[in-house]
């Protein structure tokens, strides 16, 4: 499956005379590029509101992981299957993209 980002990498590799098989050996980066920022911006009134929304949810996810050892279940864990060593912010952005959270701005 080809993505615009991967196509741009291959075109840049061709322009520089680099073997395209080496350029395509790297995985497409995750995080802010997946899900795409343009799709995330439709879930909030501004990019600043999106940052606050994602940061609050990432903090909840981080607190959830920290409380597991104590046996306290005050916070809700990830609503999507987290990848190996995936950061709480990346998990939060995927939850926002999947419309798995209810959010009222200003709270």
Swiss-Prot record:
Which GO BP terms sit in this record? DNA-templated transcription
Q: Name one GO cellular component term.
A: DNA-directed RNA polymerase complex
* Keyword Amino-acid biosynthesis belongs to the record: no
Its Enzyme Commission number(s) read: 2.7.7.6
Q: Which Pfam families match?
A: RNA_pol_Rpb6
Work out whether the entry's keyword set contains Transcription: yes
| One MF annotation (Gene Ontology) recorded for this entry | DNA-directed RNA polymerase activity
Assigned keywords, A-Z: DNA-directed RNA polymerase, Nucleotidyltransferase, Transcription, Transferase
- Reactions the enzyme catalyzes: RNA(n) + a ribonucleoside 5'-triphosphate = RNA(n+1) + diphosphate
Give each disulfide bond as a residue pair: none
Question: Enzyme class, one word?
Answer: transferase
The record, for SMART domains, names: RNA_pol_Rpb6
Biological function: Promotes RNA polymerase assembly. Latches the N- and C-terminal regions of the beta' subunit thereby facilitating its interaction with the beta and alpha subunits.
Self-association and partners: The RNAP catalytic core consists of 2 alpha, 1 beta, 1 beta' and 1 omega subunit. When a sigma factor is associated with the core the holoenzyme is formed, which can initiate transcription.
PANTHER family xrefs: DNA-DIRECTED RNA POLYMERASE SUBUNIT OMEGA
Q: Which family does it belong to?
A: Belongs to the RNA polymerase subunit omega family.
Q: List the protein's name.
A: DNA-directed RNA polymerase subunit omega
Q: Which organism is it from?
A: Mycolicibacterium smegmatis (strain ATCC 700084 / mc(2)155) (Mycobacterium smegmatis)
